[in-house]
Amino acid sequence: TLISFAVALAEAQGQISVERRDEIHAAIQGLPSMVGRTLGLFDDIRPLAHSLTAARSALYLGRDVLFPVALEGALKLKELSYIHAEGFASGEMKHGPIALIEEGLPVVALLAADEVMGKAASNLQEATARGGRIILITEERAASTVDFAESVITVPNVDPLLAPVLLTVPVQILAYLTAFEKGTDVDQPRNLAKSVTCLLYTSDAADDP
């Protein structure tokens, strides 16, 4: 995997210790079991998905390595349920996205037990103060950090390096169940194709107007 490659490269450059390398390898070995447990959250997530069906828009926030997960969550919600959604880096919220927050806006917040957890929680407080409904997706050990969240989805504790992998699972389940509750076709989303059709570039094609 890319993570294993990055770990090997970091070790070769003397950037991590042998102990840290072994910790990461052990965490990778345990990841399939954690994903399996997280896939059992359908019943917990279904009520949240039902509440999202009435929303016109939603905001996804993630800081540091969880920013791409926020983008993925927003994309999946748009693709499957046709609800407008945007993903942003939590630390950038003050520079524009905060203007989108209004009373009752669903804010799906991604939080890991890492060095930026405190800052991320502070960003979420600002969203709450402006009327945002916080749906927190986090590890079990970090759930109490945001005690003002309206709803909390917890996954097993995981190494911070692997948090994006594990937190992506409930984000995708939420999008899937929201679409299911709305009655949209999750297998054939509107206007989307599962394959890409492209024109082969040839000298003849280049001459066409």
Predicted regions span which residues?
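Phosphate-moiety recognition in structured ligand-binding domains
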Residues: 1-4, 8-32, 105-200
